[in-house]
Regions:
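Amphipathic alpha-helix from the class-I
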Residues: 1, 5-23, 37-43, 118-121
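A generic structural micro-feature
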Residues: 4, 53, 105-107
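Predominant activation on well-ordered alpha-helical scaffold segments within soluble catalytic domains
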Residues: 5-15, 36, 72, 94-97, ...
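Localized chelating/binding microdomains
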Residues: 13-16, 37-38, 45, 71, ...
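Glycine-rich beta-alpha junction loops
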Residues: 14, 35, 63-65, 86, ...
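Conserved PLP-dependent catalytic core of the aminotransferase class-I/II
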Residues: 18-71
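Conserved C-terminal alpha-helix-loop-beta "cap" of PLP-dependent enzymes
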Residues: 59-111
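PLP-dependent enzyme catalytic core of the Aspartate aminotransferase-like
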Residues: 93-141
Length: 141
C-alpha cells in the first residue's frame, strides 16, 4: 500500500522548494562568503570545496598543519565535523577527500561545516570568530 499522505507531503515540499530555491541559494552563498571573508585570512587556510560548482550550504576547508580532529574538539560552540555523518565513527581521513586526490595530511587537516535554512549572519560571524580564535591559539602553541 502506498502512503498517500507522504506522497502528497513530498509533492508539497517540492513545490515549496521550487518557489524559494533561488533566493535560498543566494542567501546561503552570502553566508558562506561572510564565513570565508573571515577565516580565509588565517595562515595555512585552504578550501576543498570547488569555488563555483558546489552547494553553497556545505563548506569543506582546513588549515595546513592543524589536525582536523584537534580543531573539531576545540570548537565547542559550533558544529563542525571531519567527514560525513555516515563516517562520524571513523578516525581516519575522509575517503572522499582522498579520492579527490588530497594527500593524507591535507585530508586529515580538513573539516566541514554547513549553513542551513535557519542559519543567520550572526551565527556565521560567531562561528568564524571562534575558528579564528582557535587557529590563532593553536598556531601560537
Amino acid at each position: 500500500t502506498l502512503a498517500t499522505h507522504q506522497i502528497v507531503g513530498l509533492s508539497e515540499a517540492a513545490k515549496l522548494m521550487s518557489s524559494c530555491q533561488s533566493v535560498e541559494l543566494q542567501r546561503l552563498q552570502a553566508l558562506k562568503s561572510l564565513f570565508l571573508d573571515n577565516v580565509s585570512k588565517l595562515p595555512g587556510f585552504f578550501q576543498n570545496s570547488h569555488p563555483e560548482n558546489h552547494f553553497p550550504g556545505i563548506l569543506n576547508f582546513g588549515f595546513s598543519g592543524v589536525d582536523g580532529e584537534t580543531l573539531l574538539l576545540a570548537a565547542s560552540r559550533i558544529a563542525v565535523s571531519t567527514g560525513s555523518a555516515c563516517n562520524s565513527e571513523k578516525i581516519e581521513a575522509s575517503h572522499v577527500l582522498r579520492g579527490l586526490g588530497l594527500t593524507e595530511d591535507h585530508a586529515a587537516s580538513s573539516i566541514r561545516t554547513s549553513f542551513g535554512r535557519y542559519t543567520t549572519a550572526e551565527d556565521v560571524r560567531s562561528a568564524s570568530e571562534e575558528i579564528c580564535t582557535i587557529i590563532n591559539r593553536l598556531i601560537a602553541e
